[in-house]
Amino acid sequence: MNLPTPLERAPDGLAPGIGLWLKREDRHDLGAFKWRGAAPTVEAYRSKGAAAVVTASTGNHGAATAWAAARSGLRSIVFAPQSVSQTKLALLKQ
């Protein structure tokens, strides 16, 4: 599973004279890099015949796992603690 992320030139003041480029993992749907670990793991389970994946998370890991599962045609269940923020809960439900 490949998800392109944009490259942006870093502001000159960040690394003067270097010409630094940034790979912006925060610029895709999930807004985090966690999908890079979740996607191949979910795909491995799918290729072994899994129908669903289950994880426990308070945010980005759970969202990435659910995202990867949906794109692999699998069902996902994410357990979150009662203390999870409403923002993270909304992300998990997406």
Pin down the residues of each PLM region.
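PLP-dependent amino-acid enzyme catalytic core
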Residues: 1-94
